Structure formats: structure tokens, C-alpha cells
């Protein structure tokens, strides 16, 4: 399974602690899936790239959106696990442009996912979703990283 973390907008050549932390979590995902950060200039670039990612199965786009559905870590893991078990090859988690996703992009998404009611800086949102992706894989693998709250 290939799970890139995409974002709209360029950070240029600068790196910061949030980029490093995002990369750390994506690297931790390596035993479970191929994960990396991917930047796109605009939404059209993301959808064009997604169109080229078709394989045996259609690429699945998950857009982080404040109007999306908020789910628990366990529910997110179950969603990822279901896609994995169905043989989905590509799940793209995408943090949108500064002014939010266009209505067209929102319609094309397989899932609109909210990280909660608070607004987050995009770099921080990337860290949070990268950590949640790693957590999801560890939940599915029965790894002790996630202890949960019952």
C-alpha cells in the first residue's frame, strides 16, 4: 500500500521542525506501507497526479477539511484497514490550500476528514495526520504504541 501525505503549496527549500517531525512519523510507517510527503502547487496538480496513480484499484483521496468528519484513532485505523483489506493500492491524505478546498475537490474526495474543531497551521496538521497514520498502522498490527482509552 502506498500512502503519501500531500499538501498544497510550496515550502520552498526551507525545512523546519514540523517538516522533520512529519518525516519521522512517515518513516516509522515503513514496515506497514510506503509513505512520503508530497507537495503540489495547486489542487489541479494534486488531481492530475492522482489520475496517474491508478493501478489495479482507483486511488483514494482523503482531504483534511474542517467541515469533514472527525473520527477516533481506532475508527481511522479501521477505515485504513478496510481499504488495505480491499486491496486499495493508493490512499492519499491531503492537507489543502490556505483558503480551503474547492467545492470540486471536496466532491471528488473519498473522505473529508476533520482533525477536530480547532484550526491548525498546515505544518502542524501534517504532523498530526502523519502521527495518526502511524498510530493507525500500529493499531492494526497490535503494536503497543497505541493503548487507547476505553
Which sequence ranges carry the predicted segments?
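N-terminal beta1-alpha1 ligand-phosphate binding loop
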Residues: 1-29
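Short glycine-/acidic-enriched loop or helix-start segments at secondary-structure transitions
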Residues: 15-17, 72-74, 103-105, 124
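A residue-level signal for conserved active-site and pocket-lining positions in enzyme catalytic cores
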Residues: 5, 62, 96
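Short glycine-rich anion-binding loops that position phosphate/pyrophosphate groups of nucleotides
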Residues: 11, 66-69, 97-101
Amino acid at each position: 500500500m502506498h500512502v503519501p501525505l500531500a499538501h498544497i503549496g510550496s515550502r520552498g527549500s526551507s525545512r523546519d521542525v514540523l517538516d522533520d517531525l512529519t518525516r519521522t512519523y512517515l518513516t516509522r510507517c515503513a514496515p506497514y506501507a510506503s509513505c512520503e510527503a508530497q507537495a503540489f502547487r495547486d489542487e489541479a496538480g494534486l488531481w492530475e497526479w492522482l489520475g496517474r496513480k491508478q493501478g489495479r484499484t482507483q486511488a483514494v483521496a482523503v482531504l483534511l477539511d474542517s467541515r469533514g468528519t472527525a473520527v477516533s484513532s481506532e475508527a481511522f485505523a479501521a477505515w485504513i484497514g478496510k481499504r488495505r483489506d480491499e486491496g486499495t493500492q493508493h490512499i492519499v491524505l491531503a492537507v489543502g490550500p490556505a483558503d480551503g478546498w474547492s467545492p470540486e475537490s471536496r466532491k471528488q474526495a473519498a473522505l473529508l476528514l476533520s482533525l477536530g474543531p480547532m484550526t491548525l497551521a498546515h505544518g502542524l496538521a501534517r504532523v498530526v495526520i502523519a502521527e495518526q497514520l502511524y498510530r493507525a498502522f500500529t493499531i492494526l498490527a497490535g503494536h503497543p504504541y497505541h493503548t487507547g482509552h476505553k
